[in-house]
């Protein structure tokens, strides 16, 4: 379930924290993906025929999760992402009552699905089919095997996958968490990516507008959320518990807006309980908000030293055997997927320019480029001055020689007249007006982008000069 109404509340109250991005914006980024959520989406989305049944092999076993996972992973890699899949471990004890409720809802949906099939109600069949889906242990193991054979890193969380994903961003081992569960923000993920598998469905179920707009994702920035809501992380956690989470019941009569106002006034749940009118707001008898809070602050996750992220070469022959022989995939289709996989691996090895600079130095990319360009200008300025001085000397000698010839003629005609002195004003070269001022770079440069504004200055600095000097700058600052 995640946090009830959280995304909408953030969109309304802290709109700067949410933005739409294209998948290209994540090129070169490591993204920690909630594997269980992805498998659930694939099983729901990829259907066969009008009865909305899962894709199956000859043995009657579901293969929608395998087909979707393989296709989507390759697509992400083709767009330059480096996916890490994180699988759920044992569910926390606090989640027991929530899981029971989900089981009851699933059972009811199965009954409604049987009735819809008897009546031939296709719309109801589609609706209830999605509600009956659950990812089995066997499907999880098959997904892990597939990813391992593809050479994709797999991490098994001791508990909640989204919590482990969030901590990977805290460890700076991943850029973002990809899941539909907003509680990843409460676990502290720096960036939350939603809709990563939005286009995972078959052609029949695809959104026709998605291809026109491109592959659009939703990005939520936790730092901007806290800034926009003007809450500390501890206050944000208590706010989310009051909104409604998987770990405990909540106070009846309190929605997201009321919860936010109460947190702003009283700062924490303890103070809220002391001050609210309990006739108006019914506090649960066994309100385990303290345990829920601790589950968000200190969830069961692997420590940084325990996390092993291995990018391996695909095991092609084993992958073919797994797909073709064990799950009856079409051989031509599998060959096509493997060809795409091998090509996509080359794309994921490309590094982002900004991450390269970040790992080298704490200076910003803009500052490094500006400093490097100034060094180029300084060198060129010195060279230009030398040329001007040499040119001046040559012209001075020529003028002196010319003057001496004139003087000699005059001396021959008028011996009594003194020799003429060369006019110093004639020696001054009009090219001196173009002597380069080193400070001109700062005046003629766009401080935001580092691009040179003045075309004349731009002619003095060729793009090849700058690109040749930047690697030297990089080498100088690498630790």
UniProtKB/Swiss-Prot annotation:
Where do the record's region annotations for I-domain lie?
124-266
Region annotation (Interaction with PCNA) ranges: 349-357
Enzyme kind, highest EC tier: hydrolase
Q: What does this protein do?
A: Structure-specific nuclease with 5'-flap endonuclease and 5'-3' exonuclease activities involved in DNA replication and repair. During DNA replication, cleaves the 5'-overhanging flap structure that is generated by displacement synthesis when DNA polymerase encounters the 5'-end of a downstream Okazaki fragment. It enters the flap from the 5'-end and then tracks to cleave the flap base, leaving a nick for ligation. Also involved in the long patch base excision repair (LP-BER) pathway, by cleaving within the apurinic/apyrimidinic (AP) site-terminated flap.
Per its UniProt record, what PANTHER family does this chain match? FLAP ENDONUCLEASE 1 (PTHR11081:SF9), FLAP ENDONUCLEASE FAMILY MEMBER (PTHR11081)
Protein residues bound to Mg(2+) 2: 181, 183, 246
Q: How is it modified after translation?
A: Phosphorylated. Phosphorylation upon DNA damage induces relocalization to the nuclear plasma.
Q: Where does DNA bind?
A: 47, 72, 160, 244, 246
Recorded protein name is Flap endonuclease 1
Q: Where does Mg(2+) 1 bind?
A: 34, 88, 160, 162
| Cofactor names | Mg(2+)
Any Pfam family from its record, for instance, is XPG_N
What GO cellular component entries does it have?
mitochondrion; nucleolus; nucleoplasm
Q: Which InterPro entries match?
A: 5-3_exonuclease, 5-3_exonuclease_C_sf, Flap_endonuc, HhH2, PIN-like_dom_sf, XPG-I_dom, XPG/Rad2, XPG_CS
Tell me the Gene Ontology biological-process terms attached to this UniProt entry.
Answer: base-excision repair; DNA replication, removal of RNA primer
Instruction: Please name the SMART domains in this protein's record.
Output: 53EXOc, HhH2, XPGI, XPGN
**UniProt cross-references to HAMAP family, sorted A to Z:** Fen
Q: Recorded E.C. number(s)?
A: 3.1.-.-
Subunit info here reads:
Interacts with PCNA. Three molecules of FEN1 bind to one PCNA trimer with each molecule binding to one PCNA monomer. PCNA stimulates the nuclease activity without altering cleavage specificity.
Entry similarity comment: Belongs to the XPG/RAD2 endonuclease family. FEN1 subfamily.
- GO molecular function terms noted in the UniProt entry: 5'-3' exonuclease activity; 5'-flap endonuclease activity; DNA binding; magnesium ion binding
Bias class Basic and acidic residues marks the residues at 404-428
> Which SUPFAM superfamilies is this protein grouped with?
5' to 3' exonuclease, C-terminal subdomain, PIN domain-like
Where is the segment annotated N-domain? 1-106
